[in-house]
Design a protein with these regions (language model features):
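Membrane-embedded alpha-helical segments and adjacent helix-loop junctions characteristic
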Residues: 55-145, 298-385
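Hydrophobic transmembrane alpha-helices that form the pore/transport pathway of multi-pass ion
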Residues: 107-199, 361-403, 468
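Juxtamembrane membrane-interface segments at transmembrane alpha-helix termini
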Residues: 50-59, 144-151, 170-172, 273-285, ...
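Alpha-helical transmembrane segments of multipass membrane proteins
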Residues: 22-26, 48, 117-121, 142-143, ...
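Alpha-helical transmembrane segments in multi-pass membrane proteins
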Residues: 39, 43-47, 51, 74, ...
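Hydrophobic transmembrane alpha-helices of multi-pass small-molecule transporters
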Residues: 1-77, 195-205, 209, 213-320, ...
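Juxtamembrane and boundary regions of transmembrane helices in multi-pass small-molecule transporters
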Residues: 31, 167-170, 178-230, 389, ...
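Short, amphipathic, aromatic/basic-enriched membrane-interface segments that mark the entry/exit
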Residues: 4-13, 100-107, 123-129, 229-238, ...
């Protein structure tokens, strides 16, 4: 019995299985019928059939799915809390006030770079990309939509800013996990990341500034501002009091309050504002918390901004994450990851090829596991001996883990991060993917440094020998 449980797929079987999964997900996305969710669900059926055909214990394999899903339960709860917060913020007039002030104060040409900077600062200070996207990101999306700026561009600026802070903040979970996996010091890890992150951030800021001036040329009039503001004033009581939920969540995040608790308390505050300021009933507030807000405004642009939110709107994203992460856990149990990763590692013959291999492994593990922690652990576990053999400092490995595993999330439509960004910002993955400049420039710089030797620190020979003797 134990022999049956330990049986795994070989390399050809693993590649065939991955091809089936990719095709099923791609077909569902292409046909626009259920998105990746049905394709990912089908992958569970494929796994069951493969287990039966090749005599592998399905009970043992599916246990890997449940173990993997347990790791992302906080993310699932966070998604639903975000849905509640968006709905209650809309009902309380918080979003309407932000839109009104933004239209009056922000020059549309500068919205994209300002969005990038705002989300970057908030994410660095709070240490959470989820929190900055759910608060500042939602607000900037609303302003951008009202200004007629391409929603994919605004979402791209939000995500790049949030991921920049998440990657560099000493309070971020990924910033602490990567050096822990690579056995590097936190300070060395952050200093090493500056080499790949700061140049790409400057380039990203320049690109969003250029896009901002191109997007708003001749497409924004004073008349449209008046129409939008009058419509918002007609439906909501606007003012500082409606900003209490937004101010509260920023304060709570700065005080290191758990993200889910901060979102929940902000939603409660929004409910009180809705009841006492907007004069909504308790039944209306509870209904909005689940079903989302529906505006009476007839202006199409404002309808697209205000008609959203609610816990129910996030359930499809919860399902995608469950199926995707569960699939990743089963693939690890089947040995699919090990076969593919080992095939990549065998081709390493220089520091440059080692960095390139680490990037590829990081993206492959992210693509399959759909989880940042799992991608860091799997990649670090596989590549650490290779880095030690070539006497490359551990902070270079931890930097590579972040340059690939952390940055890959929003670039994968079924990854937990990709699903979260699309669901929270209300923008399709295909719309914001072309504007994730920071995310796909960072690994390019990392690989360039690997082949040129720039910033690649090697361990002293004596130190390496001493560590070997101790072992």
């Amino acid at each position: 019995m134990s022999g049956t449980k330990e049986k795994k797929l070989n390399l050809p079987q693993s590649l065939l299985f991955l091809l089936l999964i990719i095709v099923s997900v791609a077909v569902c996305i292409r046909l626009k019928t259920g998105g990746p969710m049905i394709g990912l669900f089908a992958s569970w059926i494929f796994i069951y059939l493969f287990c039966k055909i090749f005599g592998i214990s399905y009970a043992n394999i599916v246990a890997g799915a449940y173990d993997a899903i347990r790791m992302v339960v906080p993310t699932l709860c966070l998604l639903m809390a975000i849905g509640v917060m968006i709905g209650t913020w809309l009902q309380s007039g918080t979003i309407a006030t932000i839109i009104s002030w933004g239209l009056k104060m922000i020059n549309p040409s500068w919205l994209l770079p300002l969005t990038l900077l705002f989300c970057s600062i908030l994410s660095i200070v709070t240490g959470t990309s989820y929190g900055s996207v759910g608060s500042a990101g939602v607000a900037m999306m609303a302003i951008g939509n009202a200004m007629g700026i391409h929603p994919g561009m605004v979402a791209g600026a939000v995500i790049c800013g949030a991921m920049f802070g998440d990657k560099l903040s000493p309070l971020s979970d990924t910033t602490n996990l990567a050096p822990a996996v690579a056995d590097a010091k936190l300070g060395d890890h952050i200093r090493s990341m500056l080499w790949t992150t700061l140049p790409t951030y400057v380039i990203t800021l320049i690109l969003f500034t250029i896009l901002g001036f191109q997007q708003t040329s001749g497409s924004y009039t004073e008349g449209s501002i008046t129409v939008y503001i009058d419509a918002l004033n007609g439906e909501f009581q606007l003012g500082w009091i409606t900003m209490i939920p937004a101010i509260l969540i920023i304060v709570l995040l700065l005080c290191k309050v758990n993200a889910i608790s901060a979102l929940g308390l902000s939603s409660f505050a929004a409910g009180f504002v809705s009841y006492f300021v907007q004069h909504d009933t308790l039944q209306d507030i509870i209904r909005t918390a689940y079903n989302g807000y529906t505006t009476a405004i007839e202006e199409p642009v404002l309808q697209s901004i205000l008609n959203r939110g609610g816990m129910g709107s996030m359930l499809q994203y919860v399902a995608i994450i469950c199926f995707a992460v569960g699939m990743g856990g089963m693939l690890e149990k089947l040995g699919v990851l090990d076969h593919i990763l080992q095939a990549i590692v065998k081709r390493i013959n220089s520091d440059g090829s080692m960095i390139l291999a680490t990037m590829i492994v990081g993206y492959v593990t992210s693509l399959i596991s759909c989880s940042q922690p799992m991608a860091h652990v799997l990649t670090g576990r596989l590549m650490a001996p290779v880095f030690q053999e070539r006497k490359v400092a551990p902070e270079i490995l931890s930097r590579c883990l972040e340059d690939s595993g952390t940055m890959a999330g929003p670039m994968i439509p079924w990854h937990g991060y990709g699903v979260y960004m699309a669901g929270t910002l209300g923008v399709a993955w295909s719309a914001f993917f072309p504007y994730l400049f920071l995310l796909y420039l960072t690994p390019v710089f990392s690989i360039f440094y690997g082949f040129t030797g720039i910033s690649i620190k090697h361990l002293p020979e004596t130190k390496n020998n001493e560590s070997k003797e101790e072992k």
